[in-house]
UniProtKB/Swiss-Prot annotation:
Intramembrane region residues: 961-986
Compositional bias ranges of the Basic and acidic residues kind: 53-70, 1062-1079
Stretches in topological domain Cytoplasmic: 1-466, 521, 572-585, 711-725, 808-819, 856-877, 919-960, 987-1079
Interaction with CA4: annotated segments: 748-779
Phosphoserine modified-residue sites: 61, 65, 68, 223, 232-233, 245, 256-257, 262, 1026, 1029, 1034, 1044, 1069
The protein's name: Electrogenic sodium bicarbonate cotransporter 1
PANTHER family: ANION EXCHANGE PROTEIN, ELECTROGENIC SODIUM BICARBONATE COTRANSPORTER 1
GO cellular component, one term: plasma membrane
Length: 1079
């Protein structure tokens, strides 16, 4: 028996296969613990009052048997041991699985105070560490906090903590209003249960009520190295001549100790800036550990108050205390006490144990929580990891939900490798989206959208009351103005100024403002699009060739298209959006993003062509370059200095006078004046402006780089959190202002933003209203239905694909979508724009994504070291409405807007195009083509889909994108919407090329991080399902005698606290606590 290995009866059912993500985020425990090679069974000692406990032991022993292990489909190894459900898991499942209507337990702030000496005389409780999510220690020297780091615990300290919970006082849901009352309650309980001698009451009370010195106070704190030099001054004080009698002891206790305790927070607590890291409803958990020389056995107590109470200066921050853990022990074990204190503090910061601590009914519940924590512990070999190395907090924390779901019940969802993991919808889709369910009633979807959005209408206005909304308004306004000017200019060229820049401004303002006020998804931004521009050009040329009235013909096309869109609304046709999977969405959004990037560089190249760089220019040959202004007609030019007008007189000189004045010096005119008066520029240096192009590219690339850098400034290490967040929110506006100032200081005449200054139609041949009859034959009104069908497809596809992208699950929108309501208002606005001869507007993908990115919300308070959590998007109607109102008022702001260089706005275009590609799986898969296998990220689809299949899917997507780009660049661009619709057919065809299993990972609308979370939950549920099936054959209830963690727990078997029996060999190697409990 001495050579036999210890049998771990709990290992088989807790077999855990760690994936890379779990290992990466859970390296939190180090230590190797000596486990005895021999096993000697404990002798069962009889107790006079332990009949019930004895019967329980015997029943458990009888029911404790080996069972066969249930193998998973993906596990090749088998175990000879039969699984037994973990008693800790069973009890935790009962605790966390209870239905409780009470709110979730609040966030805990845990503080570790240790009993240290001041100048070798007085003892004080000094703060040495604190926790919210991660551990922060007082650095050596005691003048600053360490950086937050993952708490690394010794496994031995966890065993000792478990023993503390077994043998110490557990007081749950007690009531106290002050620290002295609470201390007295604890000490009396220890005396009543025989754990403390009555003559030690005053000494323990005196010790527990000593001052608390926090790190915020500017005092002479010692380093952590002095923790081991704790003091036995309490004993000296009690044995001094002044404290010889109990009466004198009591008087000293009152005067020296209780006067140091206040029920109200101190000024240092109220001024502590660390409160910003805590939510408003946070509570405190205080851990007090120390060594004294008047105790022979450890004094251990764990207290949970019925209601959290402010206990004066006990805690660093002014938050009420809910939990109190006390450990006072004999001298010589300061290091062990310190590690036990860190262990309980770390457990209190663990989300699962945190919930158990709040819901525990007795001691066994708490012990089960510790066992569950030990089940999840990762042990690092002591020779392969230095515990002094502080582990940086991970960027993304592993979700505790998968641990909680294992115990809280729920469906046992199993994933079949031959079927899609999302439920069998062939690659995701939106079948589970309530907004896209077909009602089968006339306008049923529209009515449901109205009912869904009506309750939020008021909140859509007051939810915008945040400084973040201002930055979004300015950013999107400048993007919208630039877009309106660009498309307005192109539209004017395509339609002979029948629609121009001013019409673009007015149409954008009217359509956008009405849409944002009444549509189902006000975060969507309307704008003109490339396909609409192509259609307008073709329609104008067609009307011109056949002598049709262009505006009237366009009016009837718009009316027919609006009518068809309303039919689609009435028949709930938006349910077809559920067939737009990731393949279609990413193809469309990536194409639009690439168009933005391409157009930004195209405009800069065009600018460089207009202001060329003269590469032949040489500094030493300045005389070779010249440029002169000559009159348009050959006249006898004689230089007469006395007749040459002064510069200030040029404005009074007319073109006719200049032609008639033969003695006028044309060479005196500037370039603009020469061209204005009909002159000609002659010379090889007339178009040479060397600085404009270079300066424009500096502004262009500088704006883009600055926008990207300032947007990421939120995660930098500089400045306080509030300042970083403010800079990040206003990143685009700051970049624009910075480079506008640089442009003004340098003084180079770069091209500026030109806004119409008069409110009138661009063409004098049109008005603000288009009559519907009289310009074309009657049959044209009916024939307009044919091109209107194409426009309807264009509008429907652009609008709904953008709406799907805006309403993605990862945006965490809470007020719901409104696909039918959005399309309804697009149709109504099309009628208005058709009658006013304004451009048609539809949802703009890139600007809408930029709008959402500028309104993303994160947690206001996050624990030190913890990344802010994304909460969702600030859903409201104010930002979009004000953006379009300002766009309409831009005509009156022309004197201000003219100072903005166009290269700066092109840089904003480039930023929007690149930023909208972030988080797109298509781009991630493109990068995989350039990565060696060992450097590829841990994407969920790479775990389940062969790499060659991933590359094949990416190749097909690139091919479709290339075809769409080629189509867009030709005259056939008018059928661009039809080709977008063809992407759906291409995706359906992939069902014959890829298995549903592969498509479910490659073409799923579920975000990557949520998909990992789902998979981990399914693994846990599958594991829980096997445990449930085993539990049907076992009626073994929970007992602390049964091992419940992955490693042998025989050394932790409970023994009578005041046992008088002779300890066995195993007991001799037990913890320090067991060595002091035989008094």
């Amino acid at each position: 028996m001495e050579d036999e290995a210890v049998l771990d009866r709990g290992a088989s059912f807790l077999k855990h296969v760690c994936d890379e993500e779990e290992v990466e985020g859970h390296h939190t425990i180090y230590i190797g613990v000596h486990v005895p090679k021999s096993y000697r069974r404990r002798r069962r000692h009889k107790r006079k009052t332990g009949h019930k406990e004895k019967r329980e032991k015997e029943r458990i022993s009888e029911n404790y048997s080996d069972k066969s292990d249930v193998e998973n489909a993906d596990e090749s190894s088998s175990s000879i041991l039969k699984p037994l459900i973990s008693p800790a898991a069973e009890r935790i499942r009962f605790i966390l699985g209870e239905e409780d209507d009470s709110p979730a337990p609040p966030q805990l702030f845990t503080e570790l105070d240790e009993l240290l000496a001041v100048d070798g005389q007085e003892m004080e409780w000094k703060e040495t560490a604190r926790w919210i999510k991660f551990e922060e220690k007082v650095e050596q020297g005691g003048e600053r906090w360490s950086k937050p780091h993952v708490a690394t615990l010794s496994l031995h300290s966890l065993f000792e903590l478990r023993t503390c919970m077994e043998k110490g006082s557990i007081m749950l849901d007690r009531e106290a209003t002050s620290l002295p009352q609470l201390v007295e309650m604890i000490v009396d309980h220890q005396i009543e249960t025989g754990l403390l001698k009555p003559d030690l009451k005053d000494k323990v009370t005196y010790t527990l009520l000593r001052k608390h010195r926090h790190q915020t106070k500017k005092s002479n704190l010692r380093s952590l190295a002095d923790i081991g030099k704790t003091v036995s001054s309490a004993s000296r004080m009690f044995t001094s001549p002044d404290n010889g009698s109990p009466a004198m002891t009591h008087r000293n206790l009152t005067s020296s100790s209780l006067n140091d305790i206040s029920d109200k927070p101190e000024k240092d607590q109220l001024k502590n800036k660390f409160m910003k890291k805590l939510p408003r409803d946070a509570e405190a958990s205080n851990v007090l550990v120390g060594e004294v020389d008047f105790l022979d056995t450890p004094f251990i107590a764990f207290v949970r108050l019925q209601q959290a109470v402010m206990l004066g200066a006990l805690t660093e921050v002014p938050v009420p205390t809910r939990f109190l853990f006390i450990l006072l022990g004999p001298k010589g074990k300061a290091k062990s006490y310190h590690e036990i204190g860190r262990a309980i503090a770390t457990l209190m910061s663990d989300e699962v144990f945190h919930d158990i601590a709040y819901k525990a009914k007795d001691r066994h519940d708490l012990i089960a929580g510790i066992d569950e924590f030990l089940d999840e512990v990762i042990v690092l070999p002591p020779g392969e990891w230095d515990p002094a190395i502080r582990i940086e907090p991970p960027k993304s924390l592993p979700s505790s939900d998968k641990r909680k779901n294992m115990y809280s019940g729920g469906e046992n969802v199993q994933m079949n490798g031959d079927t899609p993991h999302d439920g069998g919808h062939g690659g995701g889709g939106h079948a589970d989206c309530e907004e896209l369910q077909r009602t089968g009633r006339f306008c049923g979807g529209l009515i449901k959208d109205l009912k869904r959005k009506a309750p939020f209408f008021a909140s859509d206005f007051y939810d915008a009351l945040n400084i973040q909304s201002l930055s979004a308004i300015l950013f999107i306004y400048l993007a919208t103005v630039t877009n309106a000017i660009t498309f307005g200019g192109l539209l004017g060229d395509a339609t002979d100024n029948m629609q121009g820049v001013l019409e673009s401004f007015l149409g954008t303002a009217v359509s956008g403002a009405i849409f944002c006020l009444f549509a189902g998804q006000p975060l969507t931004i309307l704008s003109s699009t490339g396909p609409v521009l192509v259609f307008e050009r073709l329609l104008f040329n067609f009307s011109k060739d056949h002598n049709f009235d262009y505006l009237e013909f366009r009016l009837w096309i718009g009316l027919w298209s609006a009518f068809l869109c309303l039919i689609l609304v009435a028949t709930d046709a938006s349910f077809l959006v559920q067939y737009f999977t990731r393949f279609t969405e990413e193809g469309f959004s990536s194409l639009i993003s690439f168009i933005f990037i391409y157009d930004a560089f195209k405009k800069m190249i065009k600018l460089a062509d207009y202001y060329p760089i003269n590469s032949d220019f040489k500094v030493g040959y300045n005389t070779f370059f010249s440029c002169a202004c000559v009159p348009p007609d050959p006249v006898n030019i004689s230089i007469a200095n006395d007749t040459t007008p002064a510069p200030q007189e040029l404005s009074a000189v007319s073109s006719t006078d200049m032609h008639q004045n033969a003695t006028f010096d044309w060479a005196f005119l500037s370039k603009k004046e020469c061209l204005r008066y009909g002159g000609k520029l002659v010379g090889n240096n007339c178009n040479f402006v060397p600085d404009v192009t270079l300066m424009s590219f500096i502004l262009f690339l500088g704006t883009y780089t600055s926008s990207m850098a300032l947007k990421k400034f939120k995660t930098s290490r500089y400045f306080p959190t509030t300042a970083r967040k403010l800079i990040s929110d206003f990143a685009i506006i700051l970049s624009i202002l910075i480079f506008c100032v640089i442009d003004a200081l340098v003084g180079v005449d770069t091209p500026k933003l030109i806004v119409p200054s008069e409110f009138k139609p661009t063409s004098p041949n049109r008005g603000w209203f288009v009559p519907p009859f009289g310009g074309n034959p009657w049959w044209v009104y009916l024939a307009a239905a044919i091109p209107a069908l194409l426009v309807t497809i264009l509008i429907f596809m652009d609008q709904q694909i953008t709406a799907v992208i805006v309403n993605r699950k990862e945006h965490k929108l809470k007020k719901g979508a409104g696909y039918h309501l959005d399309l309804f208002w697009v149709a109504i606005l099309m009628v208005v724009c058709s009658f006013m001869a304004l451009p048609w507007y539809v949802a703009a993908t890139v600007i809408s994504i930029a709008h959402i990115d500028s309104l993303k919300m994160e947690t206001e308070t996050s624990a030190p070291g913890e990344q802010p959590k994304f909460l969702g998007v600030r859903e409201q109607r104010v930002t979009g409405t004000l953006v379009f109102i300002l766009t309409g008022l831009s005509v009156f702001m022309a004197p201000i807007l003219k100072f903005i260089p166009m290269p700066v706005l092109y840089g904003v275009f480039l930023y929007m195009g690149v930023a909208s590609l972030n988080g797109v799986q298509f781009m991630d898969r493109l990068k995989l083509l350039l990565m060696p296998l060992k450097h590829q990220p841990d994407f969920i689809y790479l775990r389940h889909v062969p790499l060659r299949r991933v590359h094949l899917f990416t190749f097909l997507q690139v091919l479709c994108l290339a075809l769409l780009w080629i189509l867009k660049s030709t005259v056939a661009a008018i059928i661009f919407p039809v080709m977008i619709l063809a992407l759906v057919a291409v995706r359906k065809g992939m069902d014959y090329l890829f298995s549903q299993h592969d498509l479910s990972f490659l073409d799923d609308v579920i975000p990557e991080k949520d998909k990992k979370k789902k998979e981990d939950e399914k693994k846990k549920k599958k594991k829980k399902g096997s445990l449930d099936s085993d539990n049907d054959d076992s009626d073994c209830p929970y007992s602390e005698k049964v091992p419940s963690i992955k490693i042998p727990m025989d050394i932790m078997e409970q023994q009578p606290f005041l046992s008088e029996s002779k300890p066995s060999d195993r007991e001799k190697s037990s913890t320090f606590l067991e060595r002091h409990t035989s008094c």
